Amino acid sequence: MDNAVDRHVFYISDGTAITAEVLGHAVMSQFPVTISSITLPFVENESRARAVKDQIDAIYHQTGVRPLVFYSIVLPEIRAIILESEGFCQDIVQALVAPLQQEMKLDPTPIAHRTHGLNPNNLNKYDARIAAIDYTLAHDDGISLRNLDQAQVILLGVSRCGKTPTSLYLAMQFGIRAANYPFIADDMDNLVLPASLKPLQHKLFGLTIDPERLAAIREERRENSRYASLRQCRMEVAEVEALYRKNQIPWINSTNYSVEEIATKILDIMGLSRRMY
């Protein structure tokens, strides 16, 4: 077995496999192991299921260690094939459904693709999410200041502090219309809140970042430039943080947080509703 990998982990589904991945990752994060992840969506027929079984078995015979298999599969005949494999198989949905079935005295009615598929009941939500993504792309990095009043949140910050990925995550994951506005080097001589943003102060949220981390990120983009110098980064961060304090704009330091964590903190602090898709 590869010394760099402790366990091989499969995430298998007859749908997108997003549920299997999310729950499986949450479980595996509890263990101090290095994993090699394999995600296999749309395992919807017996021939594909047998190919997946063969893949699991091949890794077992190669390594001598049972692969871990997190699966979410509706059709019993497909499940049965996966369960014949040499993997340690866990039905991540059924583990929760069974006790709920007992508590609610209701039988589940599993349908493939129900969680992340399109159906007449969720088309409006899907359209709203696409509209949020379109809006966010059109208002990235201060490209357009039109219709800013339609934003649910407007992220502020220096270049490369995480505004764009956070905005896109908010739009794609939660259907939030997120604009973002950059403060650039030329702004620093007299940094003030732009007039176009003042009426929308209740929608503003600031991001900052440790200067050392900012310099490292910028160095990858523009090596040996003034833009990436630690001195420049320290000055910009100090100026922007002073602006946040002066205007009472809520803000967080993004240095040690993932995009998911940053987005969740913004939703919580700004009181924005989470939408599930």
Curated annotation (Swiss-Prot):
A single GO molecular function term of this UniProt record: phosphotransferase activity, phosphate group as acceptor
Reactions the enzyme catalyzes: [pyruvate, water dikinase] + ADP = [pyruvate, water dikinase]-phosphate + AMP + H(+); [pyruvate, water dikinase]-phosphate + phosphate + H(+) = [pyruvate, water dikinase] + diphosphate
Pfam families, A to Z: Kinase-PPPase (PF03618)
Cross-referenced InterPro entries: Kinase-pyrophosphorylase (IPR005177), PSRP (IPR026530)
E.C. number(s) listed in UniProt: 2.7.11.33, 2.7.4.28
Top-level taxon: Bacteria
Residues noted as binding ADP in the record, renumbered to the chain: G157, V158, S159, R160, C161, G162, K163, T164
Keywords: Kinase, Nucleotide-binding, Serine/threonine-protein kinase, Transferase
Cited HAMAP family: PSRP
Family: Belongs to the pyruvate, phosphate/water dikinase regulatory protein family. PSRP subfamily.
Function noted in UniProt: Bifunctional serine/threonine kinase and phosphorylase involved in the regulation of the phosphoenolpyruvate synthase (PEPS) by catalyzing its phosphorylation/dephosphorylation.
Name of protein: Phosphoenolpyruvate synthase regulatory protein
Origin species: Escherichia coli O17:K52:H18 (strain UMN026 / ExPEC)
Gene name per UniProt: ppsR
